Structures are given as C-alpha cells and as structure tokens.
Amino acid sequence: MLHRALVLLLGCASLLAQQQTQTFKITPLKPVPQLRAEALKALPPAESGPFRQPDLTELVKLDPTIKLDIHYASDNNFMGTPFYTQARAFLQRPAAEALVRANARLHKQGYGLLIFDGYRPWYVTKMFWEGTPVADHLYVADPSKGSKHNRGCAVDLTLYDLRTGQPLDMPSSYDEMSERAHSDYAGGTALQNANRALLRSALEAEGFEVNPNEWWHFDYKDWRLYPIINVPFEELTPSTAKEP
C-alpha cells in the first residue's frame, strides 16, 4: 500500500502524465513500403537448435484482465505506420503463464498489465533495423541475431490502474529512443520511478529480466530454448499458436 499512498500524494503531478501519451517518432531511412517488401523477401538467420516446439499463446485468452494497446497495429508508433493487421499479443506458453501470475500479483495492489507488444515476426524486426538511423540502433534489435520478441519470449508493457483503467505515468513514453527510456534512468519524478520499480519487481518475480535500454521491455528466462519465428499473426497455425 506504500506505492498507492505515493500515487495519491503525488497526484498533483498529473500534467507530467502527458509525456506518457506522446508518441516518439523517427523519420524512416527508407519508405515503409520499400522496407516491408525487402524484409518480406529476406530470410531469418539460420539456427542449429535444438529448440522446443513453439507454443505461442494469446495473452487475453489466458487472462482477460490483461489489457492491450498494440501500437504496431496502428499508426501510433515510432514509424507512424501499422506493422500488424491484428491487434493481438502472444507469448510462448511458459512466458504467458508467468505473465498471468505477475498480473495476479499486481491486482492485489490495485494494478494490472497493459501490453504494447509480445511475439513479433522477424520481418518486422528487419523493418525496424533498416528504417532506424544508425545512431538509434541501440533501441532496435539486430535482425542478423534476431530479437527475443521473434522467439515469443519478450513482452513490452506497462501498468494500468484497476479503478480508472488509465496507464500509470512512467519516465518516458513507449519506444522513446532516449536515456529516459533506460531502466536505471534517475531523472524521472518520484512517482514515475516508483511506477517503473513496481512493474519491474512484479515481472522479475516471475522470471523476466528488464532490458537496460527500455523500461517497458522484459525478456523471459527461457528465451534461448525457442527458435526465431517469422509468421504473421493471421498465419499462425495450431503448431505455433494454441488455445489455452
């Protein structure tokens, strides 16, 4: 309850929450249709394995109280264009079940999880890398290595208040490419830093590790056990995406 007391005490800082709703933007190095065409023709890196059979599970079917705000299914993202045709979020089953446990843990404190992204087809990672200026490559995954999102073992998320349904204020907006996005950034307000710490503690308790460059990005501990996947949501088959 200490965290909620801090939220109430610092509620007067609500103007700072506007920073959370402002979408960070870049100017892609190439036109997005060109990036997409090139990425769809490219092949993911070869891997030797062995790997577990993919078992991508849709998060909201496992726990309907998990909320979605899939930025890459709209133009509300850092490139200003949709990358997905469906606003859905998947993780490998063990990671999905761990996330559900974290959500239940947070509910006891009056909060829930709001998902920005989960499994991400490899070609989208390729588009991000090729479209982002080299100076900002710290914030996008190298497609020659693949992203943990591509393995269904990374999730981008934040917290929302169960009473209001509104996301909590954090030190930066989602996908912001600046030091404010770093998980150890100390320049936020006391409230922002407390919110970030609450999210991190809940996820770490269930086997996730925060990305040092992105407070919202968490990798599941078993990510090495799964292969890179390059299948759009609408083409996922029962062998990769299963009902709970």
Residue positions per predicted region:
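Extracytoplasmic cell-surface/polysaccharide-interacting catalytic and binding patches
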Residues: 18-118, 131-213, 222-244
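Structured alpha/beta reader/binder surfaces that contact nucleic acids or chromatin modification marks
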Residues: 128
